[in-house]
Each structure stands twice: as structure tokens, then as C-alpha cells.
Amino acid sequence: ELVDAGVKELKTADEVNEVLSQQNGTVLLIVNSVCGCAAGNMRPGVKLSIQHDKKPSKLTTVFAGVDGEAVAQARKYFLPYPPSSPSIALFKDGDLVHFLERHHIEGGSAQMIAANLQAAYDEYC
């Protein structure tokens, strides 16, 4: 669903490092999962958010429970935040600038998630 919307899957630790070690531009990294809140809220929210005028220059995802190596490497970049799936991270010039944890996604509508991300895009992209 995210890949169909133009989001690139990262399947290895090296692919995660290649994208997140870049020191210029913005990167959205989505930790996808099979849970209901990812399917019902997060993925639709991300898809809505990237219809905004401003958006990250790179859209990427790792899949918890499927791409373990890539997810473990991505989570190193999320510190000091604890592991959370699903979650959404926005990086600017190599720095983590915005992060939505599972508890921000659960119970939130796709529209709320999109609005939160779009506000971050306005500030950082």
C-alpha cells in the first residue's frame, strides 16, 4: 500500500544507513507493521500527508516483523525513543526532528495523523 504511493522499501541495514546517513534533505521513515492501527490509521494517514504541497524529499519504510535487520538499524537512529511499531520518523539533514510513536497513532484518525505530519513538513521541508 505504501510502496504503491511512492514509498521506497528498505530491506537491509545497509539500505537504512545509506538513506539516513545523508546530511542533506528530508527523509520520512515509516516503521510499518501488521497491526490494525497501521492498516486503519497510519498507512492512510501517511498517504494523505504526502499529497501536501510540502513533503519530504525521500519517502521510505521498513516493515517490523518482516525486515528485522532493517528495522533494528532504523531504531538506532530513533534514539532516545524506545522501539515502537508502527511509528513515523522525519529526519532533516541527518537529524531526527519529528517522531510519532505507536501511542500517537493508536486511536488517531488518518486525518489527524496526516495533519500532524503536514505540520511537520511545513516546519522542516
Kindly label every feature range from the protein language model.
Residues 1-23, 125:
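N-terminal leader/targeting and pre-domain segments
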Residues 18-53:
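Local sequence-structure signature of Cys/Sec-based thiol-disulfide redox active-site neighborhoods
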Residues 31, 54-73:
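Thiol-based oxidoreductase modules, predominantly thioredoxin-like and allied folds used
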Residues 33, 38-46, 58-59, 70, ...:
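Amphipathic alpha-helical interface surfaces
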Residues 43-47, 74-78, 101-104:
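"Short basic amphipathic alpha-helical interaction patches in structured regions
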Residues 71-85:
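Short acidic (Asp/Glu) patches
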Residues 82-125:
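Non-catalytic, surface beta->alpha helical segment in thiol-disulfide oxidoreductase systems
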